[in-house]
Amino acid sequence: MRALAIACVAAALLERATVATAGQSAPGPDEFAARLAALALLQSLNAELLSHDSATATLERWCANHRLAEPAQIVAERLREEKPASAEVRAALEVRPDDPLGYRRVRLKCGDHVLSEADHWYVPGRLRPEMNLTLETSDTPFGKAIAELHFRRRTLSARLLWSPLPDGWEMSATPPETEAGALAIPPYVLEHRAVLSLPGGEPISEVVETYTGEVLAFPSPVAR
């Protein structure tokens, strides 16, 4: 209910404000209504991510609900990079220092919008062979590739990388000062770290997801 209320507030505010994403300019001015709308939307997305097991499915719904692309489909753009797992990651996955781990870094896109970048460390021995093959040879999002395992997600941390309004703004008698020009949104706005586990509790992957300013790059409502 809280997420729904926040989304309704954001929709109403967006009738009055347009925001620019990732430092790009837009017609909307940097004003209190635009910043409040951006904050409400980020909190709404954060709540959705925290309350569902699949970030891919959550982003796909976000893409559809906010008309980011047609069709509203999330695709993974795989980046051929390597990043060794830290001792902390191995501890979270309950594996020994010499146990093999898979690694995958992807950008999740909806149409032309890159909505997030994700680092996945996973335990190949706890996945089905066909799932490992899919992860190694295709751009299928991780959550879709292992969906048949009915995995569960446990969030380790979630933090805003950008706050449109300063701390304590709600206690002020006057709105915070804003800058001249369009409201600029930085490249990265939200970060989640989570462990994905089998229904029995055995961990299969740790993921660090960094969400971009493009999550707010949807068209403003048309006044009627």
Q: What label would you give each PLM region?
A:
Residues 17-109, 113-175, 180-190, 197-206, ...:
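N-terminal domain-onset segments
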Residues 7-16:
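Bacterial N-terminal signal peptides
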Residues 1-4:
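Positively charged n-region of N-terminal signal peptides that target proteins for export
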